[in-house]
Amino acid sequence: MAKEFILGIDLGTTNSVVSVIENGTPKILENPNGKRTTPSVVAFKNGETIIGESAKRQLESNKDSVASIKRLMGTSQTVHLNNKDYKPEEISAMILSYMKDYADKKLGQPVKKAVITVPAYFDNAQREATKNAGIIAGLDVVRIINEPTAAALAFGLNKDKNENQKILVFDLGGGTFDVSLLEMESGTFEVLATAGDNHLGGDDWDHEIVKWMVEQIKSKYNFDPTTDKMAMARLKEEAERAKITLSEQLIANISLPFLAMNENGPVNVELEITRATFESMTEHLLQRTRKPLLDVLSEAKLTWNDINEVLLVGGSTRMPAVQKLVAEVTNKKPNNSINPDEVVSVGAAIQGAILAGEIQDVLLLDVTPLTLGIVVEGDVVAPLIPRNTTIPVTKSQIFSTAVDNQTAVTIVITQGERQLARDNKILGQFNLEGIEPAPRGIPQIEVSFSIDVNGITKVTAKDKKTNKEQTITIQNTSSLSKEEVEKMVKDAEANREADQKKRHEIEVIVKAEQLSNDLEKTLKSEQAKNLGEPQKQELQKEIDEIKELINKKDIEQLEKKITEFEQKMAQAAEFLKKQQGNNNPNTNNDNPQTN
């Protein structure tokens, strides 16, 4: 009988990763492109669904594409794509489905179960939305766990289980930021405190570079790239590349040949950004990570001397400024021994192996990130479960009526740390009716909160005298009904095989169209006048051949043409760069610097 795998999935804002435990060892499953991470991007073209790298390449040029959908999870917002409104759960489900499909192929068997990670500061609605996305993708989501907790699990896999360690996890991903403090002792991982910012991540650093590039191009090249979607797509891609380069080097060169066409011909952009400039323009983002670091220490009532390890998680922690700030605040050298892009998925896979009984003597005790309570008289919140309470947990408290002869009460559930209900998030409400008339303060209403291992909450109110009770499971206010979820599961299943069959074809065609368009722009540019007529005819012939292959959907020949095409573009870019350097040898010295 084949072993039952449980997937560990890090469903990220920017990238997603899937892994399993095989023979006691974590294994990252590569996608069809041979990459260990998959961009969390979805696009539609010609009625087909495209996921990952190919979708990312057409983000700005294709209006039917979307990224960073994780930022909308748990909200009522929708995205309009392919002539249809999609809920965030549906888009996330497409990413999960894609990952499940290639995991099935890598493992040689269908996999149904998964542990999916979420930021520690995700609220109840966001967790429900994530679980629904998994269901739509055809997965049995056996557990939702916090990303920093998963990272600590991965770190502690081969550690001495009898060794007591307090671990701080600094998790800066593409779109979210968490800090968690955990204690590891005798195989038990207990979360002591957590804090963070659901709207801070590497995307924000990229955006600052894009803004800087726009201003530089306006000033130096008399062109506004914000008016050209294709140009902005290339700027965003180059911004991310520059950020990555600046994590390793002091200077990043930005080369964007044929960025666009204006009245003077092609716009060939050459810029240079230093690490100092980059760190200066993003200092305000960096400082937003400081307070959560201090908050978790205060919440756990510990000092920095009590902390044994500081783990860096998330690709954005590769930035030197981030590492420096963490070291300065904690007075400890951060541990980056585990790949920050993969550690969360590995931890999720470990949790799956624990649930499957493959890994023994390890217990994970997670916490609820925010206080849960109910509204009492005067809009005041009565807290029942304080933030950072270990879950699963059940707590009860007795309340009473506010006026004489009251026969019904409304239970309003809140989430947050403020004293008044209006300053917190309202998760839901329900009525308990049939209370026997009595003077105010006499009836006894028992309110119970129960949070399960996935962080999902159930609230019950019971009249102690009549035994009448009402229960509500706190759902995402924008969550899908059971019927909607079932329909989406069927839709996803029905389209999965067809999408899988055509995905590769679409990816190749999209890339061919993009390259063909780039070369056509080159032929129409002023600098094309430097080419002889035979060269122009040769290039036009290649464009025509590619278009013909696209119409025929001859994928094999298209792939060969694309390879040749990319080589020609690289040669053209190098030629133009040298030509520009010869004509303007002092260009690099004229770039303004930001102090």
Swiss-Prot record:
Region (Disordered), start-end ranges: 573-595
A Pfam family of this chain: HSP70
Biased composition (Low complexity): 582-595
Cited InterPro entries: ATPase_NBD, Chaperone_DnaK, Heat_shock_70_CS, HSP70_C_sf, HSP70_peptide-bd_sf, Hsp_70_fam
Gene Ontology molecular function, alphabetical: ATP binding; ATP-dependent protein folding chaperone; unfolded protein binding
Keywords: ATP-binding, Chaperone, Nucleotide-binding, Phosphoprotein, Stress response
Induction annotation: By stress conditions e.g. heat shock.
PROSITE patterns for this protein: HSP70_1, HSP70_2, HSP70_3
Similarity comment text for this entry: Belongs to the heat shock protein 70 family.
Name of the featured protein: Chaperone protein DnaK
Organism: Metamycoplasma hominis (Mycoplasma hominis)
Encoding gene per record: dnaK
